Amino acid sequence: PAIPQEHAELAYFHEKGFEIQKRSQVLGTITRSSKGLCVAGTHGKTTTSTMAAHLFHQSHIGCTAFLGGISKNYGTNLLLSQTSPYTVIEADEFDRSFHWLSPYMSVITATDPDHLDIYGTREAYLESFRHYTTLIQPGGALIIRKGLALQPDVQPGVRVYTYSRDEGDFHAENIRIGNGEIFIDFVAPDTRINDIRLGVPIGINIENGVAAMALAHLNGVTDEEIKQGMASFRGVDRRFDFKIKTSRLVFLSD
């Protein structure tokens, strides 16, 4: 654990009878008192949740956010809003932590087996994600990457959408890559936003961006705000993070 049981400060709080909760339990409480927008998945969740948080934070809606990486836009993994009903959360599957959550909406990016020291088998790992989908609140939505080996088990009243780079209810079209830039058109069931520039022009961010934009679109972030937010997104520290980028040398931290 990050803090051993014999740590002096932890021992003090135990001795004085304070209630002590894990981070995941606290986040669960927060999702039951706000509209939790949670991003789960083996990989892609940190970038996607940070991107979604930026889309909301720079819009007229705003958000609170608890992220798994340091946003390069804000220099922190915590965003606070006094007025927004939305909380963007990176939903961590380690130790089944995401089972404490009660999402209003959730993205699932990937279900490649991981943390097998906890889960033991691929089947147990997938079952954990299936159970997670049962926690989404009626009236909310699941946005799941198209083609995953996961059968969602959502409650009645939960909408299910698919997404990916090239197909699904939400996807990208007219992808243009050149001169160090990426432009896409974002396609949703009820709209299309043309000529979106990715602030971090990396191929995988097309798919991550589609998921983040889907979450934003379904919750009232305007087309123009989405377009501006994607262009101004600067990425996440140590997630395909360019430290040196010259004509002779590229050095990445990831």
Task: Label every model-predicted segment.
Residues 119-126, 156-253:
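Adenine nucleotide phosphate-binding catalytic loops in nucleotide-utilizing enzymes
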Residues 2-146, 150-159, 210, 216-217:
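Phosphate-binding loop of NTP-binding sites
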Residues 1-2, 176:
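Beta-strand C-termini and the immediately following turn/loop, strongest in propeller blades
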